[in-house]
């Protein structure tokens, strides 16, 4: 291995290991995240509005601050939040047995407090769940009591009281919240979120690969230490290929999607030469690398089932946003540090207006659906065809219509896609075979994911119901997929990447882009860059602040003496101005003050030697002047 690659990998791995920890942050990280006075953030309130669903349910920091407000101000509100948290934990519990039964018992105890006089008196003679009817509580308790004896308790038994608790919290408690310092602090975080982003926000590390318009490298946020992947789109290369609309489309779709199974966009900014997308860093490599370099011959069905389930969830989240992916293949499925997978590279994705079918020959040869190859109109079914190709390849170790590195013309591959029936070996179980056949049906109307579907975007439900995902198979080790837990990221992956490995080509093996000649950027391009350069993306940025403990460390409300911090006090601006007026002098102020003291001291020394300052001798004044000049000269030397 070349020395350049060893150094690049060592530095990158060291940064990766420190990512999110204090040693990964800049020494000046708190300066990057200084809160302004809350009055400067009032425009954020007008811009974002005040709906409960936005502030508490969609904004991670908003939810934490609302819960903090409830805990600090009202026991009833706090109990409501605790109830919601326990129900959410119950519904996504890792264990369908004893752990879930224990949680159900704890939730029942909370609901039973309506008849508990001791608890009632501790909350101003009103129990926390007084807004729930006796019928709702008794029905829920009865169902939960029976569930505590079930081997696998139902996950939805608390859905009705949960819904009613939400309705309660969004009324009076939330109205009180937006009048407090906790909401002002939320606005301060939103203000920080809106600040401009540039190249100085990040440290850059080794190149990981190439995109269509530039390099992809690892980067680290200076303020938080969190690691990301930086995808560069060279401005001149984008313009030369007339790809402005394509680039902006990818950025806007990434910004719109918030799914744990699709790479997230955290920042978008520009430099002099490039448009930059800062994305989720996936350290585990792509499925193509694992399939052909580490596991030639294919994966076992248990591993295939896990990857296929997470990919299905990722496509479901895209389809619910009316986004068609159109480029499913092994190299576009990336593994994270723990072995979970995400869909990447949304350059060919498109938003379907009113779910209307579209037309266009895009994709990768061998993975494009027959209707794309035949240049017909298509909809979400082409993505389910891609899932079929991917599952087949993961099991068989090769694509269904083309051998790896096979020398074959594009026309021949497209003929196979249109006409040939894929062949199945003994590697496929019966469930895997029927799943692939259903997904690889030539006619979209008969394809799995496109049949018996009320809405076109609901095809994932049909696939999730297939026996491959919902039945156990002792021969392959396959078990039913716990979809709720999988969506919460609580299912342990069957494979975990080595944290000390770099799943990327050597630095010197990644080809560099040639210089683009004959392209000049003008004012029209600047207008386009303004649409692209939008800075932080809200939810990923807030999650970053929480994960790296920046939120916990900065979210203080009181000084050591118990007084409110200046940026939350109504007179805080005046306080800060007064503080700055009497603050520690700057360098030059301290320097000249020191020299003045030296001059005064020299005069005092002369006085001690018997020099009459009332009637100075001819030598006294020159001595003082010489001392002053020496001080000035010394000052000039110090400044240089």
From Swiss-Prot:
Annotated segments matching region Disordered: 610-640
Keywords from the UniProt entry: ATP-binding, Kinase, Nucleotide-binding, Phosphoprotein, Serine/threonine-protein kinase, Transferase
Reactions catalysed according to its record: [G-protein-coupled receptor] + ATP = [G-protein-coupled receptor]-phosphate + ADP + H(+)
Keyword Coiled coil: no
Database matches in InterPro entries: AGC-kinase_C (IPR000961), GPCR_kinase (IPR000239), Kinase-like_dom_sf (IPR011009), Prot_kinase_dom (IPR000719), Protein_kinase_ATP_BS (IPR017441), RGS (IPR016137), RGS_sf (IPR036305), RGS_subdomain_2 (IPR044926)
Domain AGC-kinase C-terminal intervals: 479-544
The UniProt record lists the keyword Kinase: yes
Gene3D superfamilies the UniProt entry points to: Phosphorylase Kinase, domain 1, Regulator of G-protein Signalling 4, domain 2, Transferase(Phosphotransferase) domain 1
Domain RGS residue range list: 52-187
One protein family per Pfam: Pkinase
Enzyme Commission number(s): 2.7.11.16
Residue span, Protein kinase domain: 202-469
Residue sites binding ATP per the record: 208-216, 231
Family: Belongs to the protein kinase superfamily. AGC Ser/Thr protein kinase family. GPRK subfamily.
Protein name, entry field: G protein-coupled receptor kinase 1
Lineage, opening ranks: Eukaryota, Metazoa, Ecdysozoa, Nematoda, Chromadorea
Gene: grk-1
């Amino acid at each position: 291995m070349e020395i350049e690659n060893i150094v690049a990998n060592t530095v990158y791995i060291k940064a990766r290991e420190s990512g999110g920890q204090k040693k990964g942050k800049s020494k000046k990280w708190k300066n990057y995240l200084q809160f302004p006075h809350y009055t400067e953030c009032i425009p954020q309130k007008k811009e974002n509005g005040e709906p409960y669903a936005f502030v508490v349910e969609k904004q991670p920091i908003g939810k934490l601050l609302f819960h903090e407000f409830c805990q600090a101000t009202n026991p009833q509100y706090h109990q409501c939040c605790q109830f919601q948290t326990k129900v959410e934990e119950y519904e996504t519990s890792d264990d369908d047995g004893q752990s879930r039964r224990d949680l159900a018992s704890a939730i029942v105890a909370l609901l039973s407090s309506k008849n508990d006089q001791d608890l009632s008196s501790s909350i101003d003679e009103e129990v926390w769940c007084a807004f729930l009817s006796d019928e709702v509580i008794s029905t829920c308790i009865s169902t939960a009591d029976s569930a505590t004896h079930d081997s696998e308790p139902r996950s939805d038994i608390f859905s009705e009281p949960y819904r009613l608790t939400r309705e309660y919290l969004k009324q009076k408690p939330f109205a009180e919240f937006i009048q407090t310092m906790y909401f002002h602090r939320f606005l301060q975080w939103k203000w920080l979120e809106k600040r401009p982003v540039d190249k100085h926000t990040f440290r850059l590390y080794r190149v990981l690969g190439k995109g269509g318009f530039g390099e992809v490298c690892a980067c680290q946020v200076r303020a938080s230490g969190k690691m990301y992947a930086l995808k560069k789109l060279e401005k001149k290369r984008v313009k030369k290929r007339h790809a402005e609309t394509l680039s902006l489309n990818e950025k806007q779709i990434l910004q719109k999607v918030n799914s744990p199974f699709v790479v997230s966009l955290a920042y978008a900014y520009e430099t002099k030469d490039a448009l930059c997308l800062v994305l989720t860093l996936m350290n585990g490599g792509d499925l193509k690398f694992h399939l052909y370099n580490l596991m030639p011959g294919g994966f076992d069905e248990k591993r295939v089932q896990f990857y296929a389930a997470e990919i299905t969830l990722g496509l479901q989240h895209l389809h619910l946003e009316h986004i068609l992916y159109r480029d499913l293949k092994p190299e576009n499925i990336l593994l994270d540090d723990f072995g979970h997978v995400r869909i990447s590279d949304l350059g060919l994705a498109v938003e379907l207006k009113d779910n209307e079918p579209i037309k266009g020959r895009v994709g990768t040869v061998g993975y494009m659906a027959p209707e794309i190859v035949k240049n017909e109109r298509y909809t979400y079914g082409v993505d389910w065809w891609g899932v079929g190709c991917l599952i087949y390849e993961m099991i068989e170790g090769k694509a269904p219509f083309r051998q790896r590195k096979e020398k074959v013309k594009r026309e021949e591959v497209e003929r196979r896609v249109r006409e040939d029936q894929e062949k199945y070996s003994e590697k496929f179980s019966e469930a895997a075979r029927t799943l692939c056949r259903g997904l690889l049906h030539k006619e979209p109307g008969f394809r799995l994911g496109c049949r018996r579907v009320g809405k076109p975007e609901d095809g994932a439900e049909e696939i999730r119901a297939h026996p491959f995902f919902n039945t156990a198979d002792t021969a392959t080790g396959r078990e039913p997929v716990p979809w709720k837990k999988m969506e919460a990221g609580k299912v342990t992956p069957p494979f975990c990447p080595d944290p000390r490995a770099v799943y990327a080509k050597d630095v010197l093996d990644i080809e560099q882009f040639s210089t683009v000649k004959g392209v000049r950027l003008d004012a029209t391009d600047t207008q386009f860059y303004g649409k692209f350069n939008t800075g932080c993306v809200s939810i990923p940025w807030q999650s970053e602040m929480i994960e790296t403990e920046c939120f916990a460390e900065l979210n203080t409300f009181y000084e050591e003496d118990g007084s409110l911090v200046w940026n939350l006090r109504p007179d805080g601006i005046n306080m800060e101005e007064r503080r700055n007026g009497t603050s520690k002098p700057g360098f030059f102020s301290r320097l000249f003050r020191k020299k003045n003291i030296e001059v005064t001291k020299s005069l005092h020394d002369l006085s001690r030697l018997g020099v009459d300052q009332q009637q100075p001798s001819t030598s006294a004044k020159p001595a003082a002047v010489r001392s002053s000049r020496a001080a000035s000269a010394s000052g000039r030397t110090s400044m240089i």
